[in-house]
Amino acid sequence: KPGMSELPSDELDVIKLKQGRPVFGVDLRIVDDEGQVQPWNGESTGEVRVRGNWICSGYYGVEENSSHDEEGYFGTGDVACMDPDGYMRITDRTKDVIKSGGEWISSIELENVAVGHPAVKEAAVIGVPHPRWTERPLLIVIREPGVELGKEEILGYLEGKVAKWWIPEDAVFVEEIPHTATGKISKKDLRVQFAKYPLAGAPPATGGQS
């Protein structure tokens, strides 16, 4: 974009870490759970939907076209936010995002912060059922060999680095985290493994998140 070369290096680095701007000929919008189009303000998140002459018309072998909305936008399954200059930052996948009290929490962003702790070898975050908020984040951690790391320390490490209501409800330590054939963390297997995980002090279902 014109003028980028004049930006301070730290601001330029932030832009370079984003996924870029929509290419010519593609309409792009960010949509929430209710189908409401989200503003390009660098904060609002939702599913990325695209429309254009060379966007796929559907999935091969699937007769019912459920991949597009009534306006012809294709749901990519990516969760992202757009800044005012049109640069996109992908934060998660719709199947992995944690929907808590009507808000979306990025599992990937939580994982990226957690692995910044020197005692964390690998981390995964999934949503587990909660009677009040529908889902709450659960942090699953593999410690580095020979180091001590407790629940309070790793959860405290996240404070100030993410929104307060993003802080996982609990943290568990494991010896192994399942992966797919391509080397990605298998959130599907983790959701099955921890489907009935008891969140300590989960209150009865009442009201909305505050």
PLM feature segments, named:
Residues 1-87, 94-97, 111:
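Conserved AMP-binding/adenylate-forming
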Residues 6-11, 153-160, 199-200:
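Short, positively charged
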Residues 26, 120-121, 165, 169, ...:
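Secondary-structure boundary/capping positions in well-ordered alpha/beta enzyme cores
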Residues 52, 57-58, 79-166, 176, ...:
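AMP-binding/adenylate-forming catalytic core of the ANL superfamily
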Residues 171-174:
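General small-molecule cofactor/ligand-binding pocket signal
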Residues 184-210:
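Phosphopantetheine-dependent thiolation modules in NRPS/PKS and related acyl-activating systems
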